[in-house]
């Protein structure tokens, strides 16, 4: 009673097709696919922005006195 066999699922699918029709189900499937695609693109663009923010390095000024001291020690 806890699990359904393949026949139960086929009967449910047949009833759903009869109630909604194949055109509505096709439209629903394409809408769902478009939503998933949009979600993936949004996540991908957010990841790319985060990566580019981490790769950005700030310019540093090297003090000439420290550089001269390092050369005089060698």
UniProtKB/Swiss-Prot annotation:
Recorded GO CC terms: TAT protein transport complex
Disulfide bonds: none
One MF term in the entry's GO annotations: protein transmembrane transporter activity
Any GO BP annotation: protein transport by the Tat complex
Membrane topology designation: Single-pass membrane protein
Keywords noted in UniProt: Cell inner membrane, Cell membrane, Membrane, Protein transport, Translocation, Transmembrane, Transmembrane helix, Transport
Keyword Transmembrane helix: yes
Localization per record: Cell inner membrane
Stretches that traverse the bilayer: 1-21
PANTHER family: SEC-INDEPENDENT PROTEIN TRANSLOCASE PROTEIN TATA
Function noted in UniProt: Part of the twin-arginine translocation (Tat) system that transports large folded proteins containing a characteristic twin-arginine motif in their signal peptide across membranes. TatA could form the protein-conducting channel of the Tat system.
Family per record: Belongs to the TatA/E family.
Annotated protein name in UniProt: Sec-independent protein translocase protein TatA
Lineage, top ranks: Bacteria, Pseudomonadati, Pseudomonadota, Betaproteobacteria, Nitrosomonadales
